[in-house]
């Protein structure tokens, strides 16, 4: 099993890419050589212009500014989110207090008794009537 290695390792991928690059470079050299031999004009390779120090410095500064702006925006959004969450919690606490007060008032009304200790039916019936009126299944 000579020559059979792992096909999908990082090293094999790197080797394959380098092999392809060398192959392309070799083909390009051969093409340019045949053009020259046949008498055609060989195009000059254009050198890549490296950005100047000032341009690179400006780009770096721009990237840093973008990162800072992104961080500021994210911090502001988090602050707004926290404030909204806090407000929701306060509203929920307020609603819970109102429900508790209403529940206590209702229980006090229902627990009323006559002089002989019997429960009063009027407040209980009124409470049931209120429940029926609030429920949408009974009203159309």
From Swiss-Prot:
Nucleus keyword on record: yes
Pfam families noted in UniProt: rRNA_processing
Family, similarity comment: Belongs to the FYV7 family.
Function: Involved in the processing of the 20S pre-rRNA.
Native source organism of the sequence: Eremothecium gossypii (strain ATCC 10895 / CBS 109.51 / FGSC 9923 / NRRL Y-1056)
GO biological process, one term: maturation of SSU-rRNA from tricistronic rRNA transcript (SSU-rRNA, 5.8S rRNA, LSU-rRNA)
Phylogenetic placement of the source organism: Eukaryota, Fungi, Dikarya, Ascomycota, Saccharomycotina
Protein name, as recorded: rRNA-processing protein FYV7
GO cellular component, one term: small-subunit processome
Keyword Ion transport: no
Biased composition, class Basic and acidic residues, residue ranges: 44-69, 77-105
Main location: nucleus
Disordered: region residues: 36-140
Cellular localization per UniProt: Nucleus, Nucleolus
InterPro entries xref list: Fyv7/TAP26, Fyv7_fungi
Key words, A-Z: Coiled coil, Nucleus, rRNA processing
Residue runs in coiled coils: 59-112
Superkingdom of origin: Eukaryota
